[in-house]
Structure formats: structure tokens, C-alpha cells
UniProtKB/Swiss-Prot annotation:
<keyword id="KW-0687">Ribonucleoprotein</keyword>
<dbReference type="InterPro" id="IPR036986">
    <property type="entry name" value="S4_RNA-bd_sf"/>
</dbReference>
<protein>
    <recommendedName>
        <fullName>Small ribosomal subunit protein eS4, Y isoform 1</fullName>
    </recommendedName>
</protein>
<feature type="domain" description="S4 RNA-binding">
    <location>
        <begin position="42"/>
        <end position="104"/>
    </location>
</feature>
<dbReference type="InterPro" id="IPR005824">
    <property type="entry name" value="KOW"/>
</dbReference>
<dbReference type="GO" id="GO:0019843">
    <property type="term" value="F:rRNA binding"/>
</dbReference>
<dbReference type="GO" id="GO:0003723">
    <property type="term" value="F:RNA binding"/>
</dbReference>
<dbReference type="Pfam" id="PF08071">
    <property type="entry name" value="RS4NT"/>
</dbReference>
<dbReference type="Pfam" id="PF00900">
    <property type="entry name" value="Ribosomal_S4e"/>
</dbReference>
<comment type="similarity">
    <text>Belongs to the eukaryotic ribosomal protein eS4 family.</text>
</comment>
<dbReference type="InterPro" id="IPR041982">
    <property type="entry name" value="Ribosomal_eS4_KOW"/>
</dbReference>
<keyword id="KW-0694">RNA-binding</keyword>
<dbReference type="GO" id="GO:0022627">
    <property type="term" value="C:cytosolic small ribosomal subunit"/>
</dbReference>
<dbReference type="InterPro" id="IPR032277">
    <property type="entry name" value="Ribosomal_eS4_C"/>
</dbReference>
<dbReference type="InterPro" id="IPR013843">
    <property type="entry name" value="Ribosomal_eS4_N"/>
</dbReference>
<dbReference type="InterPro" id="IPR013845">
    <property type="entry name" value="Ribosomal_eS4_central_region"/>
</dbReference>
<dbReference type="InterPro" id="IPR014722">
    <property type="entry name" value="Rib_uL2_dom2"/>
</dbReference>
Amino acid sequence: MARGPKKHLKRVAAPKHWMLDKLTGVFAPRPSTGPHKLRECLPLIIFLRNRLKYALTGDEVKKICMQRFIKIDGKVRTDITYPAGFMDVISIEKTGEHFRLVYDTKGRFAVHRITAEEAKYKLCKVRKIFVATKGIPHLVTHDARTIRYPDPLIKVNDTVQINLETGKITDFIKFDTGNLCMVTGGANLGRIGVITNREKHPGSFDVVHVKDANGNSFATRLSNIFVIGKGNKPWISLPRGKGIRLTIAEERDKRLAAKQSSG
């Protein structure tokens, strides 16, 4: 009987969106416990080594982190397996680069560069609202932040904009039809569209219908919806493709057109 925490992760069992090949080794970096779930995060080592190619080995990543160059959400992180996740801002002071972790339409974390201005805030989905001791209202976000005394108009499933320096809420977007959202789970992971309607199913999962910029409609669970803008104006810059998933035929046509124009 195994007691205590698991400390290893086999490469074959690692999440597919990390895009690790099966044959390079036996193990994958097991993310530390932190604000994002193991299967929904991207360990810092994979971001620096496999995505940005700033290091060749895990030891090199360790050396970069231990020099305190890497900040996540404005805090220095020296743990190479720190679980960065959706909407986190990764800043590298030395190179003056800032990244926001958002999904591309294939459901992977895109390397999405942002300006220093945009790196000052992040969006968080409200998971839970409760009243604690002495009647103080608390709000819990998707990245495990607990914020006291939130605006009483903020409800569960809304999105709050958080200033990373102070950790305070600066603004919020209601979960409402007509607002722009990104899908953060399920088969439509990474797609962006406008909420058209919400079906309530008491005792089961509420279903939300979304329509993307090309007019394609799809439905997903309420728990997978993350509001990112009022109307159709996003509050963050979007990765390439703007969250519109092409069909296989459309992708092929796009590739051929690009090939002809270059050839």
C-alpha cells in the first residue's frame, strides 16, 4: 500500500498537450502542487525548455530559475516544476519578455507574447463565493486566489480582472449572453466565441451554447466556459487564429493557399 504523495510521473501518462515524445526518456516532470491541476497546467521546466528552447536540459532550467529571472503572476518562482496554468503571466525580466498562457484551438498552451502593459493584470474566473467568520464575504478564483470583500455584484462564473501587483480586483465581467468567452475544457478546448444561451439542468450540468466569429455554433458545459470580454471585445490579446477552429478541409485549403502564394 503506497503511502504519501506521488513523486513521479511516467512520460506515457503525462498530459498530451505537453507534447512530450514517448521515446526520449521514461519520466516526465511531475508538477508541484499549486494553483492549477496536474492535467491542466504546464510545468515551468516544459515552458522554458521545450517551448522557448532557452535551456537544453533540466539542469539548465534549474540554473535559470535559481537566478530568480522567472516571475509568474509577478512573483519570483524558483521551482522548476511549478504548475503554471490558464491565464498566468510569465515574465522574464532579463529579456524583457512577457507571456500569457492561453489555449490555442488544438487545446495546447500557446506561446503567446504580450506587452509589459498587459502583463500587469490577469483575468480569473470566480469559482466560489462564501461568507466566512464575522460575516466577511470571500471570493475564490480558478487559480486558487481568495479575495476578501469583493463587489457584491460579482457572482459565481463571472470573470474578475486582477491587478497582479496588489492582488486587488480592478474590474469584472458578468457571465451573460452576448459576452465573449473561451472554452477551457472538453472537446472544444481553446475555441473562442460569443455566448448565445444557457440551458439550466438542475441536478446535472448546465449547457452553454457558443457561436464563434465564423458563425459556427457549439455547446459545452458551464464549468468549461471562461468569459474573456464584454460584447465581442476581448480584455486580453488573443493568440494566433483568434480561437476559431478550422475543419480539416479548411486547414488544408489554407495550407495550399499559403504554399501557392510563397511558391
